Protein backbone atom coordinates (compact mmCIF):
# COMPACT_ATOMS: atom_id res chain seq x y z
CA UNK A 1 0.00 0.00 0.00
CA UNK A 2 1.07 3.59 -0.38
CA UNK A 3 0.18 4.82 3.07
CA UNK A 4 2.40 7.65 4.22
CA UNK A 5 2.08 7.11 7.97
CA UNK A 6 0.71 3.78 9.16
CA UNK A 7 0.19 5.20 12.68
CA UNK A 8 -1.94 8.13 11.51
CA UNK A 9 -5.71 7.91 11.60
CA UNK A 10 -7.39 7.00 8.35
CA UNK A 11 -9.09 10.40 8.17
CA UNK A 12 -5.76 12.21 8.64
CA UNK A 13 -4.08 9.91 6.10
CA UNK A 14 -6.73 10.55 3.46
CA UNK A 15 -6.77 14.31 4.05
CA UNK A 16 -2.96 14.42 3.85
CA UNK A 17 -3.27 13.24 0.24
CA UNK A 18 -4.73 16.60 -0.78
CA UNK A 19 -1.29 18.19 -0.85
CA UNK A 20 -2.11 21.12 -3.14
CA UNK A 21 -5.13 22.08 -1.06
CA UNK A 22 -3.04 21.91 2.10
CA UNK A 23 -0.30 24.04 0.48
CA UNK A 24 -2.86 26.64 -0.60
CA UNK A 25 -4.34 26.74 2.91
CA UNK A 26 -0.90 27.11 4.51
CA UNK A 27 0.05 29.86 2.04
CA UNK A 28 -3.21 31.71 2.73
CA UNK A 29 -2.47 31.60 6.46
CA UNK A 30 1.08 32.88 5.88
CA UNK A 31 -0.18 35.72 3.70
CA UNK A 32 -2.86 36.61 6.22
CA UNK A 33 -0.23 36.90 8.96
CA UNK A 34 2.04 39.02 6.74
CA UNK A 35 -0.84 41.29 5.73
CA UNK A 36 -1.82 41.80 9.37
CA UNK A 37 1.76 42.50 10.44
CA UNK A 38 2.54 44.92 7.61
CA UNK A 39 -0.77 46.78 7.78
CA UNK A 40 -0.25 47.33 11.53
CA UNK A 41 3.05 49.00 10.59
CA UNK A 42 1.30 51.15 7.99
CA UNK A 43 3.04 49.47 5.04
CA UNK A 44 1.59 48.79 1.59
CA UNK A 45 -0.04 45.38 1.38
CA UNK A 46 -1.64 45.58 -2.09
CA UNK A 47 0.63 42.93 -3.65
CA UNK A 48 0.04 40.59 -0.72
CA UNK A 49 -3.71 41.16 -0.90
CA UNK A 50 -3.65 40.34 -4.61
CA UNK A 51 -1.72 37.10 -4.00
CA UNK A 52 -4.00 36.26 -1.07
CA UNK A 53 -7.04 36.62 -3.33
CA UNK A 54 -5.51 34.32 -5.93
CA UNK A 55 -4.55 31.74 -3.31
CA UNK A 56 -8.03 31.86 -1.76
CA UNK A 57 -9.66 31.45 -5.18
CA UNK A 58 -7.50 28.41 -5.93
CA UNK A 59 -8.15 26.96 -2.45
CA UNK A 60 -11.89 27.35 -2.93
CA UNK A 61 -11.77 25.98 -6.50
CA UNK A 62 -9.95 22.86 -5.26
CA UNK A 63 -12.58 22.30 -2.58
CA UNK A 64 -10.46 23.32 0.38
CA UNK A 65 -13.43 24.31 2.50
CA UNK A 66 -15.08 20.93 1.90
CA UNK A 67 -11.91 18.84 2.28
CA UNK A 68 -12.79 17.08 5.53
CA UNK A 69 -16.44 16.65 4.56
CA UNK A 70 -15.43 15.13 1.21
CA UNK A 71 -12.88 12.83 2.88
CA UNK A 72 -15.57 11.59 5.27
CA UNK A 73 -18.05 11.02 2.41
CA UNK A 74 -15.50 9.03 0.41
CA UNK A 75 -14.43 6.92 3.39
CA UNK A 76 -18.07 6.21 4.26
CA UNK A 77 -18.85 5.35 0.65
CA UNK A 78 -16.02 2.84 0.59
CA UNK A 79 -17.38 1.08 3.66
CA UNK A 80 -15.67 2.69 6.63
CA UNK A 81 -17.74 3.45 9.72
CA UNK A 82 -17.51 6.89 11.33
CA UNK A 83 -15.88 5.19 14.33
CA UNK A 84 -13.10 3.95 12.01
CA UNK A 85 -12.05 7.46 11.01
CA UNK A 86 -9.92 7.95 14.14
CA UNK A 87 -8.37 4.48 14.11
CA UNK A 88 -4.73 4.14 12.99
CA UNK A 89 -4.18 2.88 9.45
CA UNK A 90 -2.03 0.06 10.84
CA UNK A 91 -5.11 -1.56 12.42
CA UNK A 92 -6.63 -2.33 9.01
CA UNK A 93 -6.00 -5.37 6.82
CA UNK A 94 -4.50 -5.13 3.35
CA UNK A 95 -7.91 -5.00 1.67
CA UNK A 96 -9.01 -2.13 3.88
CA UNK A 97 -5.69 -0.35 3.35
CA UNK A 98 -6.38 -0.59 -0.39
CA UNK A 99 -9.65 1.24 0.31
CA UNK A 100 -7.71 3.91 2.20
CA UNK A 101 -5.41 4.32 -0.82
CA UNK A 102 -8.41 4.52 -3.16
CA UNK A 103 -9.97 7.14 -0.87
CA UNK A 104 -6.80 9.22 -1.11
CA UNK A 105 -6.89 9.06 -4.90
CA UNK A 106 -10.57 9.99 -5.10
CA UNK A 107 -10.10 12.92 -2.72
CA UNK A 108 -7.26 14.31 -4.87
CA UNK A 109 -9.76 14.51 -7.74
CA UNK A 110 -7.26 14.42 -10.63
CA UNK A 111 -8.28 15.58 -14.10
CA UNK A 112 -7.62 12.02 -15.30
CA UNK A 113 -8.57 9.27 -12.87
CA UNK A 114 -6.80 5.97 -13.65
CA UNK A 115 -8.36 2.93 -11.98
CA UNK A 116 -6.92 -0.58 -12.28
CA UNK A 117 -9.37 -3.21 -11.01
CA UNK A 118 -11.03 -0.73 -8.64
CA UNK A 119 -13.65 -3.21 -7.43
CA UNK A 120 -11.09 -5.62 -5.96
CA UNK A 121 -11.52 -5.82 -2.16
CA UNK A 122 -14.82 -3.92 -2.30
CA UNK A 123 -18.16 -5.23 -1.07
CA UNK A 124 -21.33 -4.74 -3.11
CA UNK A 125 -22.37 -1.54 -1.31
CA UNK A 126 -18.94 0.03 -1.88
CA UNK A 127 -18.98 -0.99 -5.55
CA UNK A 128 -22.38 0.64 -5.95
CA UNK A 129 -21.15 3.80 -4.23
CA UNK A 130 -18.05 3.87 -6.49
CA UNK A 131 -20.29 3.53 -9.57
CA UNK A 132 -22.21 6.62 -8.49
CA UNK A 133 -19.01 8.49 -7.72
CA UNK A 134 -17.61 7.75 -11.17
CA UNK A 135 -20.92 8.58 -12.87
CA UNK A 136 -20.77 12.05 -11.31
CA UNK A 137 -17.03 12.56 -11.80
CA UNK A 138 -16.33 15.74 -13.73
CA UNK A 139 -12.99 14.60 -15.13
CA UNK A 140 -11.89 11.80 -17.44
CA UNK A 141 -11.82 8.26 -16.04
CA UNK A 142 -9.86 5.34 -17.47
CA UNK A 143 -10.83 1.98 -15.97
CA UNK A 144 -9.20 -1.40 -16.41
CA UNK A 145 -11.51 -4.05 -14.98
CA UNK A 146 -12.82 -7.57 -15.40
CA UNK A 147 -16.06 -6.60 -13.65
CA UNK A 148 -18.46 -6.41 -16.60
CA UNK A 149 -21.41 -5.06 -14.58
CA UNK A 150 -19.22 -2.33 -13.12
CA UNK A 151 -17.92 -1.39 -16.55
CA UNK A 152 -21.44 -1.29 -18.00
CA UNK A 153 -22.55 1.04 -15.22
CA UNK A 154 -19.55 3.36 -15.50
CA UNK A 155 -18.41 3.68 -19.09
CA UNK A 156 -19.81 5.29 -22.20
CA UNK A 157 -16.72 4.65 -24.34
CA UNK A 158 -14.49 1.59 -24.67
CA UNK A 159 -10.92 1.60 -25.95
CA UNK A 160 -9.86 -1.82 -27.21
CA UNK A 161 -6.16 -2.57 -27.58
CA UNK A 162 -5.68 -5.33 -30.16
CA UNK A 163 -2.72 -6.06 -32.42
CA UNK A 164 -0.92 -2.91 -31.30
CA UNK A 165 -3.89 -0.74 -32.29
CA UNK A 166 -6.35 1.14 -30.15
CA UNK A 167 -9.92 1.30 -31.40
CA UNK A 168 -12.55 3.30 -29.55
CA UNK A 169 -16.23 2.43 -29.36
CA UNK A 170 -19.11 4.53 -28.07
CA UNK A 171 -21.46 2.78 -25.67
CA UNK A 172 -21.34 0.40 -22.74
CA UNK A 173 -18.89 -2.42 -22.36
CA UNK A 174 -21.60 -4.98 -23.22
CA UNK A 175 -22.47 -3.11 -26.42
CA UNK A 176 -18.78 -3.24 -27.36
CA UNK A 177 -18.76 -7.02 -26.93
Residue ranges and their predicted role:
Residues 1-177:
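ABC ATP-binding cassette signature C-motif
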Amino acid sequence: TNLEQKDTTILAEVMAAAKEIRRMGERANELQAQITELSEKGKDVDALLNEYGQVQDRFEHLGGYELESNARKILSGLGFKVTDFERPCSEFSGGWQMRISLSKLLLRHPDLLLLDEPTNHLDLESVQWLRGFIANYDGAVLIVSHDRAFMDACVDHVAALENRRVTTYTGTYSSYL
